[in-house]
Amino acid sequence: MPSGKGWKDGAAMNAIQKYFKYRQSLIDQYAKGDMTKREYLQKNYEAVVYGDIGPFRNMDTVEKALFNYQYYNALAKENKTISTTRDMDYELKRDYLEKSNYYYSRKDRATLTALRMLDFRGVVAYFVKVRSRFLKGKLFEIVIEEENIILHSTSPLVLNCLREEGVFQEESRKSLIDEYVNHRY
């Protein structure tokens, strides 16, 4: 069996490709109506948490940064969902929300890493038209056009970086994945 950094990087890249292929099949099933948004989120969560790879400490490729985005986004959404459990103790609810916010901050770090590696080339960002009053004027979409990648954030830090790089368009648009974005889970 080969050893060394090259082999590990190759195995990691194969695992990342395998994950994104599986994720695309989940997206296709959701788009066809074969699964609910909650089922999609649960299966995606299981894929990143119980898969062959975990988050990368060293995000030295765009692919690793994008995997970390998915990993931390899945954990954030799962913890946020758990926090809405009825009759949950207030302290426990707060703990889950704090974990969710922590994971969202890690997701935003991965977002910035990927964008910086791309030098913000081929990136367009804008606010998303949402039904949620809480997310209105906060949620924005980041599109990496050449790769057909869509990311979302509410981070003021990410927003400021996008503005500084001149890729944020000061308008609200319908999300490219509007049905998903505006569907509650």
Label each PLM-derived region with a short phrase.
Residues 8-42:
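Short terminal alpha-helical segments
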Residues 35, 40, 140-144, 151:
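Short linear proline/tyrosine/threonine-rich motifs used for host-factor recruitment
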Residues 30-39, 81-94, 167:
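Charged, low-complexity interaction regions
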Residues 38-44, 89-109:
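Short, charged, amphipathic alpha-helical segments
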Residues 23-26, 65, 69-72, 76-83, ...:
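Non-transmembrane amphipathic alpha-helical segments
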Residues 155-166:
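A short, charged, amphipathic alpha-helix used as a generic interaction element across diverse proteins
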Residues 9-13, 31-34, 49-73:
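Short, charge/polar-rich alpha-helical segments
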Residues 51-58, 102-121:
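Amphipathic alpha-helical coiled-coil segments
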